[in-house]
């Protein structure tokens, strides 16, 4: 007996897609999946970050909606989840927070005033935002604007979601020779390193300079080393594990020092005490190890980010008229140093925070030109985004930069066409 004919109505675009499912180009569904942090569950990443269905972001006149292929993992997500030092909800007032300050993806929708980008463009995202309407944003340094903020940390619309919302001036061309996950892993740390070394004239890196790079195998340090080498300068990489020596030398460092061979770390002892005298002797022994690499030259720039544990030594080993530039205090914020070595030798202590678009674009050009490797250490799937942050929080991640997949279904995909093919669309 013949079966009755069943007429199936044509299916139109859906209003919620599975992660990795590709909507028609430019179709913005009403809802999306995201890893969400809420104020009432601040704590470790695997409790604070939960998958939820939330409304897809609307875009303003100068904003862009990006279909996220992969996202970078950094400490912004850990801090946001912990709610420390403050809850991001107290900054942006949104009831839910989506972390993520690095992304690669495809432009999916644009605001009415966006001219530089079109739907379908493959992009990477840098994380600086501002209102664009003050003197610093117009002729000055946008990083000094009172409205300056870090997307995905001080804003609620970061990259750990199917779609993220950004200002159009956050977008940069994606290096097509990289995979989606490699493209997502480097922008925050590379642009930060670039501003540290090139953004504080006259103390900008030059050929022949010597640069001391703390944490040389870490997500930030790998770019300090590579930028120095690519600029004709000499990087002295500081490590804490001899197994990382060859890795750092392979990035272009002139020499490597294991800080565990010395005992001059932590807050500086009180001046003119026996403890201080012992500290000075050990710090000078560390300086001698630097001289063995540089040919008895003090370093022009100290690339500093551990903070409390290393800052006293950093200010000691910088040359007369040199600079200690720092962007973080991962070992603590109570920085101590012997002021005599700073004022009498006229050294500069310079704080540095991320980068503006011109600096981020210059940093990205190093990658586009294949002069800088993103040093991606590992990639995890979408379902393990909270786990990735736990690994970072507990310092269980590998050297380099970590990424997570979002809509890219597997590692190794290098174009939107690859993603469409992998999805079976």
Residue ranges and their predicted role:
Residues 270-292, 296, 333-379, 386-390, ...:
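C-terminal substrate-binding/catalytic core of Rossmann-like NAD(P)-dependent dehydrogenases/reductases
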Residues 217, 225:
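N-terminal Rossmann NAD(P)H-binding glycine-rich loop of SDR-like oxidoreductase domains
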Residues 79, 92, 101, 129-215, ...:
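NAD(P)H dinucleotide-binding glycine-rich loop of Rossmann-like/cofactor-binding domains
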Residues 192, 219-220, 309:
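Hydrophobic/small residue at the entry helix of a nucleotide-binding pocket
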Residues 206, 318-319:
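Helix-to-beta-strand junctions that scaffold the AdoMet/dcAdoMet cofactor pocket
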Residues 2-30, 312-315, 357-425:
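C-terminal hydrophobic helical "lid"/dimerization subdomain
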Residues 55-73, 85-138, 170, 175-177:
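Glycine-rich beta-strand-centered segment in the early N-terminal region that forms part
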Residues 213, 229-309:
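Adenosine-nucleotide cofactor-binding segment
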């Amino acid at each position: 007996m013949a079966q009755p004919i069943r007429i199936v109505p044509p299916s139109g675009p859906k209003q919620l897609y599975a992660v990795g499912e590709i909507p028609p180009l430019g179709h913005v569904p009403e809802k999306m999946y995201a890893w969400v942090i809420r104020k009432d569950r601040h704590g470790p990443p695997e409790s604070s970050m939960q998958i939820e269905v939330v409304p897809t972001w609307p875009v303003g006149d100068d904003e862009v909606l990006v279909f996220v292929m992969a996202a970078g993992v950094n400490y912004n997500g850990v801090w946001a989840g912990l709610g420390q030092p403050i809850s991001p909800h107290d900054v942006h007032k949104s009831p839910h927070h989506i972390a993520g300050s690095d992304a690669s993806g495809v432009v999916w929708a644009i605001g009415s005033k966006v001219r530089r980008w079109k739907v379908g463009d493959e992009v990477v995202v840098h994380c600086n935002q501002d209102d664009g309407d003050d003197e610093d944003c117009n002729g000055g340094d946008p990083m000094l604007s009172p409205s300056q903020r870090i997307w995905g940390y001080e804003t609620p619309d970061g990259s750990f979601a199917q779609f993220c919302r950004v200002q159009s001036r956050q977008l940069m061309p994606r290096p097509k020779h990289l995979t989606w996950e490699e493209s997502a892993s480097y922008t925050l740390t590379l642009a930060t390193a670039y501003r540290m070394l090139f953004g504080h004239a006259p103390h900008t890196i030059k050929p022949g300079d010597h640069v001391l790079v703390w944490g040389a195998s870490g997500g930030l340090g790998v770019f300090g080393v590579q930028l120095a080498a690519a600029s004709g300068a000499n990087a002295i990489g500081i490590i804490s594990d001899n197994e990382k020596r060859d890795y750092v030398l392979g990035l272009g460092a002139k020499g490597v020092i294991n800080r565990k061979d010395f005992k001059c770390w932590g807050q500086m002892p009180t001046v003119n005490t026996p403890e201080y005298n012992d500290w000075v002797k050990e710090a000078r022994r560390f300086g001698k190890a630097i001289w063995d690499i540089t040919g008895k030259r003090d370093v022009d720039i100290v690339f500093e980010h551990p903070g409390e544990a290393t800052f006293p030594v950093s200010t000691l080993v910088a040359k007369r008229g040199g600079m200690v530039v720092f962007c973080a205090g991962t070992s603590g914020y109570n920085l101590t140093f012997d002021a005599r070595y700073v004022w009498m030798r006229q050294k500069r202590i310079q704080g540095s925070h991320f980068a503006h678009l011109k600096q981020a674009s210059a940093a990205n050009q190093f990658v586009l030109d294949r002069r800088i490797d993103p040093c991606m250490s590992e990639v995890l799937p979408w379902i393990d985004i909270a786990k990735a942050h736990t690994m970072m929080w507990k310092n269980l991640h590998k050297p380099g930069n970590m990424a997570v997949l979002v809509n890219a279904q597997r590692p190794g995909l290098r174009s939107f066409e690859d993603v469409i093919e992998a999805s079976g669309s």
